[in-house]
């Protein structure tokens, strides 16, 4: 596939464009160790030119329980944003908001903290998330997800209202 071809040819810019366009769909089907290996070969300077690809990779790292690597990518994303002040305000807001959404998953079972990050994302974003598919709402179509996040006896109604308010993206 394209990722292998671009890696073998050393065309890491094209590889980053594929990751960005794919938005993590293909990555989810790959062996995480392969993606980590490719990521290790990709020059940081190239990665920093593709902040959306970094965000897609951050989400993949979360899915694969590679939290230290996710946080390393977050630092690289922050450096990328600092190095590109020329980004249009709308694009910058969308990227920063997407980052907040991805980071919110680190606050599993803490609706208040997740909500804070979701609200921050909503204030910054003008488009739906690229790396997080919103079909099925915040429970991703699974009632068991609701039960994972519900934590206060008698508080379900207010928790649902809080999530509905802060999850437009």
Task: Locate each region found by the language model.
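Internal alpha-solenoid helical repeat scaffolds
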Residues: 45-169
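Extended alpha-helical scaffolding segments used for macromolecular assembly and cargo binding
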Residues: 1-53, 57-60, 69, 73-76
